[in-house]
Amino acid sequence: MKTGVATSRTDRLASKYLRLAKYAVVSPMIGLIVRYSSFLDGTNGAPPATLNYGADGDFIKQGDTIVAAIGRDVPLDETTRVLDIGCGIGRIATAFARQNRIGLYRGFDVVRYGILWCRKAIRDPRYRFDYANIRNDFYNPFGAVEPEDYTFPYEDRSFDLAVAISVFTHLPESQTRRYFAEAMRCLDTGGRAYFTTFLAENRQPGARFALAHSIGEALVERLEEPDLAVGYSRAFWERLAAEHDAVIETVHDGSWSGRKGLRDFQDVLIFRKTG
């Protein structure tokens, strides 16, 4: 038993130091290559697979699929102002740009080379990408700003749509509350938020994540690595929305729960700003 515990701790330490090496040492070097050469520019509007830290699979197809899903529930036109929270390396931004479906886009992320790549790939003046030097245990371990203290660099009521894909599925309660409050501050009255999450009550036998451990309102997959997968109850989201003059307008259940035949992997919550 003790041997197993020791091995687990060793594995966790090894994993931690590998992440530190990748994102504290290698990541800045990648940023320099992206900024000053064309070696990592990618092809056909997509980054090289080695740079795509957001998700595995077909970058173009995934972006188009997400934007199509958003468009089924949220009106998009040449006047729509979009905030992309955790924009990554531009999976959604490049899809919006290809389809020319919106009027203004702002995205931010904690991985600098992702922001640098986006700035090179999308030159449209309606699009802007901001580096957020937020501390993140996985992607930005030496970040200068704590997530709970971060203020989105945008004016009040300056967006019609806020998007967060696979962001709240990795945030503890304190950070979730801060990001949600900031998103609602930035949304105009009547604006909508398209957020993905794991709704804890949706779990069934065979669910991808058990989310068996509680940390405050959050339910996590692993106590030793809590940001691996984080879920919340629908009641939590409803209370949070009410605190910020918003309501849940639409819910789409995801297949992570163990249910078959669903369109999305993560659950989708669409909020409407009422005040």
Task: Identify the residue ranges that each predicted region occupies.
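A conserved beta-strand element that flanks and buttresses the S-adenosyl-L-methionine
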Residues: 163
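Class I (Rossmann-like) S-adenosyl-L-methionine-dependent methyltransferase catalytic domain
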Residues: 2-73, 89-96, 101-151, 177-178, ...
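Structural signature of beta-strand start/N-cap positions in the alpha/beta core
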Residues: 81, 104, 158-160
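A short glycine-rich, Lys/Arg-flanked "PGG" loop and its adjoining helix->strand segment in the class I
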Residues: 177-189
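Helix-capping/helix-break motifs at membrane-protein junctions
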Residues: 172-173
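Short glycine-centered segments of the SAM/dcSAM-binding site in methyltransferase folds
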Residues: 81, 190-192
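Conserved class I S-adenosyl-L-methionine
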Residues: 79-88, 106
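Short catalytic micro-motifs in class I SAM-dependent methyltransferases
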Residues: 166-167
